[in-house]
Amino acid sequence: EMQRSLVGSEMCIRDRFKYVERFSHVMHIITDVEGKLRSDKTCFDALGSTLPAGTLSGAPKIRAMEIIDELEKTKRSTYGGAIGYISFNGNFDSCITIRTGVFKDGKAYIQAGGGIVYDSIPENEYQESINKASAVLRAIEEAGDIV
């Protein structure tokens, strides 16, 4: 997806192999990808070409998004979007908003999910979703103790 904004096929995986990064409630496979933008593209084009992230939408992306729209009762809102920064020297970095609470009218709204693939075990995927949501819930509880 990002390749559409890059010069030729100048996209490379910085670390030849993916690595696992451990967080408080879950683990993620991380891969750092770099590329050189075409002269007619900006970092916004590169970011836009990757959203929503395939890891959250599934593949093929357009059909997967149609199915999500048909089946999910609640819109994803900021979930699955991106938060990031652009520095004055042109550096750009972003992350997917997958563990984020949205506060509205005195309530916190939290969305979490897991990836379902051919050999998924439903109970494990459900527990993964609970683990992901619990990290945000715990942060809200701890913030409430401070405020």
Regions found by a protein language model. Give the residues of each.
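Single conserved hydrophobic/aromatic residue that forms the stacking wall/gate
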Residues: 1-8, 12-13
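Gly/Ser/Thr-rich active-site loops/lids in small-molecule metabolic enzymes
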Residues: 14-29
